[in-house]
Amino acid sequence: MLIRPARAEEAGALAALAVRSKGHWPYSAAFLKRFERTLALTPEVVASNDVLVAERDSVVSGFYVLLHRDGLAVLDDLWLEPAEIGRGCGRKLFEHAAARAAARGARVLEWEAEPYAVGFYERMGGETVGWVDSPLGRRLPVMRLGLEGPEGGTTTP
């Protein structure tokens, strides 16, 4: 599996992948349509942020968006093609995002989790530290992971 920077012209395909990924869970078609309208994955966003894709056999199988803010990295998106769920792609993308965040000086990785994916994120070492209201009217868990500090020790969220 290759992980590489996304290209701006892939924004539409990545947004469609996110909708397919969300559709893996038991959401209604109406909810998925509302979700699609909230996506802000434009060519400009891809070009100006840390957006990386995973490819298997030259086909995009997932992606993540990583934002950087004063020692904190925010995993803004992590989505997989439904066929990739449970095949290790999510783990590889998450580990890549955490390592990339640490390499850029972040001490903590934080994200708002898809509720159906909380178990995955807990297996990755994430802990729920709060809750936030989503634009879609749901409560989402806010999760954090301490990253390797400059002395090699893990920081706590």
Regions found by a protein language model. Name each.
Residues 2-16:
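A short beta-loop-alpha structural element at the N-terminal edge
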Residues 16-41:
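Conserved GNAT-fold acetyl-CoA-binding loop/helix
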Residues 42-53, 74:
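A short helix-loop-beta-strand connector motif used in the catalytic cores of GNAT acetyltransferases and
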Residues 53, 59-67, 74-79:
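Conserved beta-strand in the GNAT
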Residues 71, 110-112, 127-145:
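Conserved catalytic-core motifs of GNAT/GCN5-like acyltransferases
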Residues 84, 88-96:
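Conserved acetyl-CoA pyrophosphate-binding loop and the N-cap/start of the following alpha-helix
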Residues 101-114:
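Conserved GNAT acetyl-CoA-binding A-motif
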Residues 121, 126:
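Conserved active-site tyrosine of GNAT-family acetyltransferases
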